[in-house]
Each structure stands twice: as structure tokens, then as C-alpha cells.
């Protein structure tokens, strides 16, 4: 028995430590899956030995102590957490338990919602006015974050509509959309500021700022999902209908919430959300399944720390612990040298991960990473796996320092790091085989010259056999040469020659994008093409002339001019448009915005968030056809922002600058006007 008591005490100590790191310091040391594993072990031991359960066990409470820096708030109705299930079998067991408690075999109706990965908050409205906001804290006592929450534009300061209760406590999640998170971290890197490991940490850190002016600059948003205190009014006796009522009063509710009857419908909802997860624009880690009927909720009641009528149906963990075996350095299209960690293979989010990006030397230093370290690796959707933390206490004695190369690992050229930039680059240009391969892959890609059938493996063979040294060489390939490549028969070779010939008919914007100029993406290439109209005018433009192009600042102008000034690049461009190769595009058609009868004519428009009725490309094309200039970033020159679902930092910046904002439905209406 002594060993069991010791094991239980060790688990409790470890869990309390991780709760403090997660909830109070916003600096978790282990992924959620590791915490869940420890909690599962403790629950199993306490279940087998109920006489050892104590009131202060982590299984008996919700979270960690509140920060002393904030005033404390006592929740009149405790903010409980949820029990978890991790697979379909466990969910079906939960479903059966609920049926058994209700003594009914009838299909159960649930309200199914997204399990947002943010920070749970309580919003208290009195006579429709927001008077207090608080964190969950330990479920009984939280932190008063009213000043910070008032800066979140998604949260109404006053409810609108009829029959608003005298006192209503709404509960929900403050979170940070992925686009806003990425932009915030990018800005922090440029200013040597704090880099957040993930959007959840960023949201928690932002909402707990002692200075609300800092919170106001963070791209936070909110969805509500429930109610706590209710006085002086009534709410529907259906959870789903309550969400709809909240929506009518002006509170944001996710449009992915759905009422499902029977276990099959719930499982179908779970699978669909898991499939759509990467398209949402914000992080979730599962779905929440709640009995819809409030009377049945009250019948089922609660256990010590969670309701019996709800569960969190979690997705496979997106973070896991593994070990760094080695670090290698890869060279990209623009010469950027990226360190890549070779890992002990580990299952993350349903995929075996053996490599993870380390970004740059600054990131290695920030992490304090060494070869041999035990690390937390994260994989979210289709995002490249990355190391987000080091578990320093597990560092072995023989851990090795990571030395960034002074010479390119591919061609041996000097490595250069420009002052103010985080990225180190190979100076070899197209003499570097790695840069050559990536530049050619970009040149033939779908959004560039769009050479059908010219895949990565073909490019790699062409470079390795030295058949191709620059983009112009692609158009000198014959079917005979191509037939000598692996898995390339005469018919496939001729098809590829035909595809190369077809790709010569392109647009000026695609041609510029295909060249691979640093910082010149599709939108910038389109702006350059529209502004200058011809290649000759662009080639003659100095930096000041380039800066006159919409969304082209000092940095992009310098990169563009530097690219065009390089002798090898000039030679390749002239070869590509020469009579020998003959890449060409239609003469520019000048669109006079004043002559177009459209509400978008002459306006600089920015799209942000996820669109449901049109793809991003379709929306851009239709807006451009109606005389708009579609930009990739918000500035004082922006006239209009179109905000889709989970719009992030661009929406926040537009609101700060007082720029007009419309939603997708209004855009669709105006497109048809």
C-alpha cells in the first residue's frame, strides 16, 4: 500500500506542477496528451483505492490558483471542466451510461459544438450591460479580467433585443485565430519580442496582460457556449435554442454547432469536423457533446468536477514528446538555410513524425535546444511539424550544441545573414543545386507557369543530370532527352514537351511570380504587372518607382530591384522572352475604374478569414473584374476589408484604422449588384 500512496502523491505533485505552468504561467512544459495520461493514471489509482481520495487531489478540482495580480472573483455558479473521451468506443460507453442513468433506450439528442483551444471566460451582464468578466481559475475563484475583455471587439458591451434577463452570466472561450497568431509572432520576431508556441498560449497570455492596451492590440475573438448564473429572466429549455437566443442578443456563436440525435449522428459530426479542422482558421482539439434537453441535464446532474450530461470528445493529440537525434540544414529556393530536427519517430495527430522544422538560428537559441534533448513536437493539420518546447530536466549528459553552418551544406558558398533578418542565406544563387531545384519547382508550379506533369522528381533528375541550370533550359528540352529520365516513356516525354510549349502563353503577373523574386507573392506580382503594364517599364523602374506600386514598400522594392540587377537574372529573363523560347502574354488591358459601374471600382480591397460561398481565388477574380485592387495586407491605403469566418489580425487592424468592413454575405450581394 505504501508504494501506491507514494505513486499517487507523485502523480498529484506532477499534475499540480503542470496545472500551475499551464493555467497560471501560460508556459506548459508538456503537451495535453501527457497531462491527460498522468490524470488518467491518477484517476485509475483513486478509483481502485477510493479511501485515498483527498479534497485537494487534482481529480477533485478544475484548474490552478488565480494570479495574485488580478482581483479575484468568486463564481456564484462554479465553472466546471469536462470529462474526456478519446475514441469512438469510449464515446459509445458514455452514451450508454447516460441512457442507463435516464433508464431509457430512446435515442438521445445532443447539441454538438467545437471544442475551442483557448481560454474559458465568464461574462456577467446586468440589465444587458457587461459589468464583469472573469477567468475560470480553479472553477470556484477566477481572475477579474473585465478591462481586458472589453477590448475584444467580438464581445458586445451591451446585449440587444428583447427579454434580456436582469442578470445573465454567459460562458465561452476567448481564442486567437491562426492568421492573427502567425502575424503577431512574425511581428514579434522582427522586433525581438516574445514568441508564443501556439495560439492557445497566445490567447491566455494576451487576456492576462495587466495593461489592457496590450490586450487591445492582440487579435483575440470569442464564441459563447453556455450559461452560468441566470436571474430575473428565462431561457429556453434546450441548449441549442439557448445558443440561438444568445446569437439574437448579439453574442457570437460558432455556426458549426449542430443538434444531433442518436450516437451515429454524433459520430458523423465528429468525423466531419475532424476532416474540416484545418480549414476552420482557428485551433480546436475536439468536439463537445452536451445533452440538449435542460431538464435531462438537471436530472443527470454532476460529479465532483464535471457534468454527467456532457463530454469532450477529443481528437488525436497534436503534441507529443520525443527526442532529437540530429539536426540537418536544408537550403530553399531563395537560399534560406533552415535547420531541421531529425526525431525519434512519434505518432502526432494520426501521422508518424520523424522531422520537424526549427526555423532559424534565433529559434534554436530561444528554445535552448541541443541534440539529444527531449522535446515537445506539434503538428496541427497540414502545418509542417515543429518543435515548440524543450523538457530541460530530461537533458542527457552527452547532449550536443547545435552549430549553424558558415558555408552552404550543398554548394559550399558563404552563408550570409543580413542585419535585422532572422534567416541566414546561401550566397551561391543558381550555382547552388539546392536553390536551383527549388527555383525550378516554383517556376513550373500551378500558380506560376503551370507546366502540367512537371513534378518535383523530374526537376530533381534534370538538375542532378545537369540537363537544366536555369528556367530557360527547360524550354530547350527534347522528348529524346526526357525519355532518358526514370519512369519517362516516349509518350510521357512528348506530353511534357507539349506542356512546356503550352505554358509559354501566360500572363505578365504569372511570369513575374514564376521568377521567384524574394517577397513577391501572387498579389504583389499582380500589382507590379498592373502598375507597369510591360516588362520593359518594370525593368527600367528604380526603387522609388517600385514603391509607388500598391502594397510595395521599401523592402519589397529593394528585393525586386536587386533581383532585376543581377546579371544572371537579366540573361535568363531575356532568354525566356526571346524569339527562341517565346514566352509571351497579352498586351495590358487598361481598366478605368471610373468607367466601371461597380461598388468595388477603384477600391483597394483586402480579404481575411475563411469564405464559404466562394474560394479565395474566385473572390479575387470577381473583385478584380469589377475594378478592385485586391491586396494582401491592411494599410491606410485600404478602402474595404471583407471579413469571413474567424477573421484575424487584418480585421483588428482595419477596425483600428476605421476602415469599412463587410462580411461575405454583403460581398456576394454587392457582386451581384
Curated annotation (Swiss-Prot):
A cellular component annotation (GO) from this entry: cytosol
Active-site positions on this chain: 115
Residue numbers binding NAD(+): 32-36, 81-82, 113, 136, 173, 290, 314
Keywords tagged on the record: DNA damage, DNA repair, DNA replication, Ligase, Magnesium, Manganese, Metal-binding, NAD, Zinc
InterPro entries (UniProt xref): BRCT_dom (IPR001357), BRCT_dom_sf (IPR036420), DisA/LigA_HHH (IPR041663), DNA_ligase (IPR001679), DNA_ligase_AS (IPR018239), DNA_ligase_CS (IPR033136), DNAligase_adenylation (IPR013839), DNAligase_N (IPR013840)
UniProt cross-references to Gene3D superfamilies, sorted A to Z: 5' to 3' exonuclease, C-terminal subdomain, 6.20.10.30, BRCT domain, DNA ligase/mRNA capping enzyme, Helix hairpin bin, Nucleic acid-binding proteins
Reported cofactor(s): Mg(2+); Mn(2+)
Domain of life: Bacteria
KW Manganese (keyword) present: yes
CDD domains: BRCT_DNA_ligase_like, LIGANc
SUPFAM superfamilies linked: BRCT domain, DNA ligase/mRNA capping enzyme, catalytic domain, Nucleic acid-binding proteins, RuvA domain 2-like
One Pfam family matching this protein: BRCT
Gene Ontology terms for molecular function: DNA binding; DNA ligase (NAD+) activity; metal ion binding
Reactions mediated catalytically: NAD(+) + (deoxyribonucleotide)n-3'-hydroxyl + 5'-phospho-(deoxyribonucleotide)m = (deoxyribonucleotide)n+m + AMP + beta-nicotinamide D-nucleotide
Binding site for Zn(2+): 408, 411, 426, 432
Annotated ranges, domain BRCT: 595-673
Record EC number: 6.5.1.2
GO biological process terms, semicolon-separated: DNA repair; DNA replication
Regions that span the bilayer: none
Family indicated by similarity: Belongs to the NAD-dependent DNA ligase family. LigA subfamily.
Listed NCBIfam families: dnlj (TIGR00575), PRK07956.1 (NF005932)
Function: DNA ligase that catalyzes the formation of phosphodiester linkages between 5'-phosphoryl and 3'-hydroxyl groups in double-stranded DNA using NAD as a coenzyme and as the energy source for the reaction. It is essential for DNA replication and repair of damaged DNA.
PANTHER family named in the record: CHROMOSOME TRANSMISSION FIDELITY FACTOR 18, DNA LIGASE
Name of this protein: DNA ligase
Native organism: Serratia proteamaculans (strain 568)
